Amino acid sequence: MSAPCHCQHADDDYSSIKKLSVLSPELQQEFKDPNHPANLICELCRLFYDNNWVTGTGGGISIRDVDGPNPNLVYIAPSGVQKERIQPWEMFLVELPQEKILRTPNDIPKELTKSYKYKPSACTPLFISCYTLRNAGACIHTHSQHAVMVTLFFENEKEFVISHIEQIKALPKLKYNQETGKIEKIGSMEYYDKLVIPIIENTPHEEDLTDSLQEAIKNYPGASAVLVRRHGIYVWGETVWKAKVYNEAIDYLLELAVKMKLAGIPLVKEE
């Protein structure tokens, strides 16, 4: 059975409230909050769809409830659904560090899900890796054409490197703290800095990327993203809004890099 059809922007306030009324009082209270992680995932998925980042059910997003009473709760969009139509009750809820699934959309009344059998996102182990290795507040996975094109232009490279572009300043400057054993933000990148993003090879199945993603995260403590060749990109940040900004800034730089490459302009300016 295909995923239930949730027409984008079609529901008025009354219709939305009517849908929520079939949920438990606890869930009704959760989903009425526009800043609830599940609602933010829906909002961002629509924005990302409009940017051609999550078309054809591709890509995904997850948010850790860093501002909630339990910051170990992670909300993850399901697999195989049209991201621009997603609804808050369709999220999987996972608790760290045991990675215990606390709630699935299959637990929701069938009036909302139309008996559709939801599957966890294949990105789940990769999202979890970003939370455990970087203490991220959110992780975004897109199938951006700019990300794919850059990995094709640099087919034999293991890194994407660019410098002397103003937009680099939107990204964090990170450093490994030997005393704490953690990656810490020490400021923002500067115009003269080199942005380095590791590139890993794609695999037939998304979850098989986990080991190489973890290795890249460990080997590149200054990175906030990992490119997957011929596939897309994973981007994370300390909050969902930081992750959004980093993703937008990186995609801008990737698009610019494609244009620079076509024009024969070096991506790294020598001092």
Swiss-Prot record:
Main localization, broad class: cytoplasm
Cofactors demanded by this protein: Zn(2+)
UniProt keyword annotations, A-Z: Amino-acid biosynthesis, Cytoplasm, Lyase, Metal-binding, Methionine biosynthesis, Zinc
Compartment list: Cytoplasm
Cofactor: how and how many bound: Binds 1 zinc ion per subunit.
Binding residue positions for substrate: 123
The reaction(s) this protein catalyses: 5-(methylsulfanyl)-D-ribulose 1-phosphate = 5-methylsulfanyl-2,3-dioxopentyl phosphate + H2O
Top-rank taxon: Eukaryota
Keyword DNA-binding: no
Pfam families: Aldolase_II (PF00596)
SUPFAM superfamilies for this protein: AraD/HMP-PK domain-like (SSF53639)
EC code(s) of this entry: 4.2.1.109
Binding residues for Zn(2+): 141, 143, 231
One annotated Gene Ontology cellular component of this protein: cytoplasm
UniProt GO molecular function: methylthioribulose 1-phosphate dehydratase activity; zinc ion binding
Record-annotated active site: 166
Family affiliation: Belongs to the aldolase class II family. MtnB subfamily.
Name of the protein in question: Methylthioribulose-1-phosphate dehydratase
Organism: Candida dubliniensis (strain CD36 / ATCC MYA-646 / CBS 7987 / NCPF 3949 / NRRL Y-17841)
Taxonomic classification: Eukaryota, Fungi, Dikarya, Ascomycota, Saccharomycotina
